[in-house]
Every structure is written in structure tokens, then in C-alpha cells.
Amino acid sequence: MKKIKDKKNSLGDGIYLKNNKWSFSGDASKNFDKHIIRSVPLYLEGHKMIEDLSRYTLSKKSLCYDIGCSTGTLLNKLAKINKNARFIGIDKEKDMIKIANTKKKFKNISYICNDIMKYRMKKSDLIISYYTAQFMNPKLRQSFFDKVYNSLNWGGMFILFEKVRGSDARFQDIYNNLYYNFKRSQGFTNFEIVNKEKSLVGVMNPFTENANNDFLKRAGFVDIEYIMKEICFSGLVSIK
């Protein structure tokens, strides 16, 4: 089905509906960085937080995974300040991996196009899921967290940033209104906001903060701390 590039199909930033569903390929990959910065509150601040946290867990010959690495922006930042560590970015979208490779600035970064649930991870000291798990099939979510826990070395760190649901309908309504106001403040039109919400139905499946905590605890994590929160977007750190 051919995309029609007009206002009715626009999601903003040169990205258009593709078969009425959000996709990370094509226009989305080419314009991803600009779009995500305008779409997610404190997106770049989250990157800075991860840079700072990486200093506590990465050392010489440490391995770090970025699951759902998209265009590789975060790994370039991490590799710059952790020159003796190794970084592997994993993303199942080949268009994202292609862009990440063209943007790669450091030799200690490598990119792999694969589904994380099919990829055999090595023992590592840091695993990052930056707004990635929310796009996984809910049936696989617990298996994903189990895999992360089992792949970490003792004392290793898992950094998880997610869009989250409100704990009840009242809080969800508040989240929605505050988030839509944020997107309008970033220049998105009402058409684009509604189109994006429709495109994510069945594609993105966020859980509540409590549910994410439960996933982590069932996987084996005990030490869990929230490090960032803005509207319905939160970041936490778990240490094995």
C-alpha cells in the first residue's frame, strides 16, 4: 500500500503513516533522531544520565549492549567516554542499523541487525533498553527481562527507560493530557498527534511502573531505583 504524503497522513518530521501503522523503517529511520527528541520529554537528558551511570559499571574490556540502538546516537556518546570498553548495538530494523553504521565514530562499537530474543548475548557489565521494551510483544516481556538478568555479570547494571501507563484511568487521563500539551509545545499539530496515537495501537504496549518492577523482580533483580521521571516517561536502574 503506497504512502500518501499529505497532512492527513503526517506524523511530523517528514514521517508518514505506512499501512496505518508505525514503522521504524524508511522515513522513520531517516528522521528518527529529530522526531524522538521532540516526542519524548528529557530524551537527551536521559542520554546524559546513562553516560554518567556508565562510569560506575564499565571498565577496561567491559561489554555493553544497547538493545534497540536505533541510529546509534547513544553508543557514540558512551564510546567517547569509555574508550576501553566494547559496545554492541542491536536492532532488528536494517534501516536503523545502516544509519548507525554510517554514523559510527569509534572502533569499539559494532552493530548487529537481529531480534534480541533470537540473539545469543555474552556476559556483560551494562545493558541498556532505551524506550525499546515497550515495543516488544507483551507475551515476550518477561522472557526479555529474564534474558537481560542472565546475561549480566554479577554487579552488572541494567538501565531501562520506558513510556508507562497510569496506575488507574484517572492518572492515565492526566498523563494523556499533559503529554499532548507537551507535544503541542514541541510544534506537533493535532492531526500529527492523533495520527501517531492511532499508528501505535498494537505496536507499542507500555505497562505501569509497578508492572515493570514486577518483571524485573521475577527476573531476579533486587536492587531497583528510579532515576528519572517526566509525565509518563520513566527511567530506572537495576543492579544484579
Question: What role is predicted for each listed range?
Answer:
Residues 128:
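A conserved beta-strand element that flanks and buttresses the S-adenosyl-L-methionine
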Residues 142-154:
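A short glycine-rich, Lys/Arg-flanked "PGG" loop and its adjoining helix->strand segment in the class I
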